[in-house]
Amino acid sequence: MENERKGAGSHLRRASRFRSYDRESSGSPAVTSRGSDRAEQPLAVNELELLKPVSRSFYLSIRLLPRTLREPVALAYLLARTSDTIADSNAMPAEKRIELLDRFARAIAGKDQSIGKALKDLLLSKQDGSQSSSRSRGTKTPQDLSSGITEGEKALLESAEKILRALKNLSPEDQRDVRELLAIITRGQREDLTRWSGGLAALANAQELLDYTHLVAGCVGEFWTRVCFRKVQSFTARLEADMLELGTNYGRGLQLVNILRDAGSDLRAGRCYFPEDELRAADLSASDLLDAPAAFLPIYSRWIAEARAGLDAGLEYAIAINPARVRVATVLPAMIGVRTLSLLEESGLDALRTRVKVPRSEVRGMIASTTITLASQSRLRRARAQL
C-alpha cells in the first residue's frame, strides 16, 4: 500500500509539471478567447471548492481547464448539481420538489430573485428529516444519509445565491450557453419526478432511455463543444457538426455508466431506467430486478455495450482536440467510465446489490497516465484501439 501511495505521488508530481507547462495566462498560445466574449470578472464563488465534494471525476477534469473555459463549465455543473439536489430531496413530496425545481430554473433564467430563502428552507427540512429519522432509530446522524444531505450538497444549497450571482459575471455568450443548457437539464429532472411519482416503473423503450440521457447529459456534450468552438483558438480541425454529434454521444455514454452503476439504488428508490419492452421480452418486470434474476443479465450487458460505444465516441472526440490541456480534461471522464464498465462486467448482477466504484488509488493513476502518457493524440488512438 505504501509503495502504491509513493507511486501515485510520483506520478502526480510529474502531472503538476505538465500543468505548469500550460499555465493560465492571457498570453497562453493554447487557449485564448475569441468572438465577442468580454473578459470575465472574478467569480463570486470558489467553484473548485464546491465541486470537489460532489463530483470527484468532474473536479479533476475542471482543474485542468484554463480559466476562460473553467468558469462557464464549472458554474454550469454547479447549477446542474444544485438542481439535482433539489430533485433528489426525499424530505419533500414530489409536488413540492417540482415547484422548487421550477423556481430554481426561473432563477437561472434571471426571473426569480428570492430563491435563496426557499433553498434554505429545503436545507432545514432535509436536516430535520435526517435528525428525526436518526432519533427514531436511536442512532447518531452520520455525515451522509440517503434520506438526508451530504456536506457537499449542503454547501451547494447554501451557496446557491452566490452561484447565481457568479453566472451574471460571465460574458453574455457564456450566460446564454449556460442558461440554455440548464433549461434542458431541469426539464429532464422535472420529467424524472413526474414519471416516477406513482411507484416503481420502467421506461417504455430504448428511445425513451436515449431521450432521457440526452436531456440530462447528451446536452452537456453539446454545451462543451459550443463553448470550446467559441472560446478556443484552433480547437479542432473537424467540423462543428461532427464534434456536436460525438459530444452528444459521449455525454449519453457517461450517463449510461451512471445508470448502470446506480441501477440497484435506483430500483430500491422506485426508478427503473431499463426499457420495459426489453424486460417484457425476457418475461421480467421492473420489480423482478430487485432480485437480480439471471434473465436480466443479457439486457444489462447490452446497455454496458451501449455505454461503451458512447465512451468510444468520447475518445474519438478527445483525439480530435488540438490543445493538450483541453484534450486531457475532456478524456479523463471517459477513462474513468471505461474502468467503471469493466468493474461492472466483472461484478455482473452483483452490481445491483453492491455499488461499484473505481478506487481512489486507480483514479489517481488515471490522472497521472492521462496527463503524462495520453496527452499525445497518437497514444490516445492506441488506447482507443485497445478498448
Region locations from a protein language model:
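Catalytic cores of Mg2+-dependent Asp-rich isoprenoid enzymes
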Residues: 2-7, 11-254, 260-387
